[in-house]
Amino acid sequence: MAVTFAGQPVTLKGETKHPGDKAPDFKAIDRDLNTRALDEFLGERFTVISVVPSIDTGVCDYQTKHFNKTLNETDGVNVVTVSNDLPFAQARWCASAGLEDIVTLSDHRDLDFAHNYGTLMEEHRLQARAVFVLDSNKKIVHVEYVDEVTEHPDYDAVIKLLKA
């Protein structure tokens, strides 16, 4: 899979996922520095894992706000945002955005998520932009690795799937 960052090819490390795959477990750090696991965030129907390079960039900011605000009232759907930002940066962003109740997880320590989902941009030690939708049995039903990391994912495809 060819992915670019600001027009330059990057190497993705880890195991690429596809629809039908079982979502691998992972551990990441929450804003209170607690180690958390995927099973803690599974929705009754679906879980959206929104992966961003850095919460402090415009596209990542929009992606995080858009998925959380749009899907907030969709029954049985949980949204989790994963980045390599430090938990303190995620907490600051959530407070400034007025979104203290959303779930953000930092993969900065062990890169466990990145290795399990194939999102590590080796050259930058950042996550590639991606979206994974899991059903309640942890089966991946939608995957998007965004070809150009500085671009937006296909929000409509995810929202259409979840609101059907």
Feature names for model-found ranges:
Residues 1-164:
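Chalcogenol-based redox active-site neighborhoods
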